[in-house]
Amino acid sequence: MISPQEKQDKVIRATDLDALSCRYSANNKSYFSKPDPFIDSLISSYKMHLPLCTGYTNMSANRTLRSVFNEQKLPLINRGTYLRTESIDVITQEFIKEFKKCQVISLGGGSDTRCFRILEEHGEDVRYCEIDFHESVKIKKLAIINDKKLADIVKYDEESQSITSKEEFARLESNIHTENYHLIGYDLRELTGALDSGAILEYVDTSLPTLILSECVLCYLNPKENERIIEFWKNAFASKALLALLIYEPMSLNDAFGTTMTHNLSNRGINLLTFNEYPNLEARYKFLSEKCQSSNVKLTDMSNVGGYDSDNTTKAWINSKDLARINRLELVDEIEEIRLLLKHYCLCYCEFSHSPSLKTINKWKWILE
């Protein structure tokens, strides 16, 4: 029997499977201009090792995996996944292009494959750190060490491992540390602003311009934990290199659609603790600029990113050629429906430092800045 906290953590970890299945679907439908060759390795590791995780049996793990990967995703979900992935990718690539030698820290990196794409292209210049729950990290570690291509990309040269029991899985060291890649098992809720989390900072280079990514991660923490985690990173980089934060997550907008989202998530045992606390772009701007004391704050909803609220010719997030391409992939009948859905997801960027800002952050159209 698992504890209530373990049960809640299991629910949160399961959202990583949701995200992976959405990327898998969008990839299979050819939404990404460059197909993602790394997704299958993560899925294989999940299929092999999810039964070994806390709260799962072979039967329940297989049922969960069938549920998420056999489900046909709606076109609006595939399009939303594309816009989410593409918008974060373009900002990350611009950050790397502008600063050359830099660092990316992914909070709740889980099954995300962005690290492999970036290190494959920029491995000599970019230091990449991923932090997530221990069990999520172990599944990713096993994907890496049992796939030569992934191991070569992150420069991991130890032998592959076969883990077949819960006992072996529990004993497995979760972390990977190579020259430019660090995979760290850590509960982000344990971070404090006091810089007492040496397990993290030991592998972070605070002299490098750094972009922190949070994709649907901070939304599972309460507002105080949000402040504490941001304060931790702010203190770590105080008076040093540029620290930038990029957040993607849902917001309620205090409307009927937001209420429906809340009920649907609640039925799955998911409580988005910032969903109603910061219900719109204005509330999030105030949180980042006033409570967190960040600068160069910029926010948009994903409807704007997808070009549903503008002519998409000035400072467009997605160029007209790519928009035309994805419009041909699947028919989306209800434009108003996808616009409404995308209105409830936001992209937030801000900086902490007196160092030079990311100049090219202004190349895209933001709603609030």
Swiss-Prot record:
The keyword Amino-acid biosynthesis does not apply. Its EC number is 2.1.1.233. The keyword Cell division does not apply. GO terms for biological process: methylation. GO terms for molecular function: protein C-terminal leucine carboxyl O-methyltransferase activity. It comes from the Eukaryota. InterPro entries: LCMT1, Ppm1/Ppm2/Tcmp, SAM-dependent_MTases_sf. Belongs to the methyltransferase superfamily. LCMT family. This is Leucine carboxyl methyltransferase 1. It comes from Debaryomyces hansenii (strain ATCC 36239 / CBS 767 / BCRC 21394 / JCM 1990 / NBRC 0083 / IGC 2968) (Yeast).
